[in-house]
């Protein structure tokens, strides 16, 4: 439903009168004012709201409005970019409510909890998924996913990857059948071992 709120911004006040392409342009623009962002977050045009969720300068107020929308699409986009900060237990609650055992949302789940991909111009560096939940997600992966080195590499690249998870990936056997999608597992294991060394060194320094 379109909001009846009166804004100071002429753009915000006229969102309801704009063409979809005009809303999209404002949603993508990093310098769109906060009132216009909020008006877009409250408008009916879903694609415009998706572009807003992907905007690196989305405001907290607009992000909160998108977060409160039904479903998991906006939630996954905001989580992947670190736009929403949750308590540790809330990450697990969101995962179990919207993504666990839901094959339709697998790609969105990976985006939400492991961060965006290189082709999305995002990374896992802003992603705050707790280590315990990363281990739960790893345990929930289907057999096909555990045979894709790219999927496993996203766990290693996550800033909260645990020592236990890195060790498990470092001992992964080669998949029974290599395919176009399977990168070298030897390289993957080596990267996981480097992560083990990194975590071990960090923990040793922290304990001094």
Named regions from a protein language model:
Residues 2-208:
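Alpha-helical scaffold segments
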């Amino acid at each position: 439903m379109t909001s009846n709120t009166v804004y100071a911004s002429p753009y915000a006040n006229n969102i309801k009168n704009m063409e979809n392409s005009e809303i999209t342009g404002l949603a993508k623009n990093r310098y769109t004012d906060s009132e216009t962002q909020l008006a877009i977050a409250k408008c009916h045009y879903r694609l415009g709201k998706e572009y807003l969720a992907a905007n690196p300068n989305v405001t907290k107020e607009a992000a909160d409005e998108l977060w409160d929308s039904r479903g998991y699409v906006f939630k996954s986009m905001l989580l992947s970019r670190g736009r929403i900060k949750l308590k540790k237990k809330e990450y697990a609650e969101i995962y179990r409510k919207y993504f666990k055992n839901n094959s339709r949302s697998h790609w969105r789940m990976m985006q939400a909890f492991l961060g965006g991909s290189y082709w999305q111009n995002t990374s896992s560096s802003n992603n705050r998924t707790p280590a315990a939940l990363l281990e739960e997600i790893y345990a929930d992966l289907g057999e096909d996913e555990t045979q894709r080195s790219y999927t496993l590499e996203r766990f290693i690249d996550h800033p909260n990857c645990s020592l236990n998870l890195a060790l498990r990936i470092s001992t992964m056997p080669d998949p029974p059948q290599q395919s176009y999608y399977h990168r070298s597992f030897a390289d993957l294991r080596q990267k996981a071992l480097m992560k083990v060394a990194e975590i071990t060194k960090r923990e040793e320094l922290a304990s001094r």
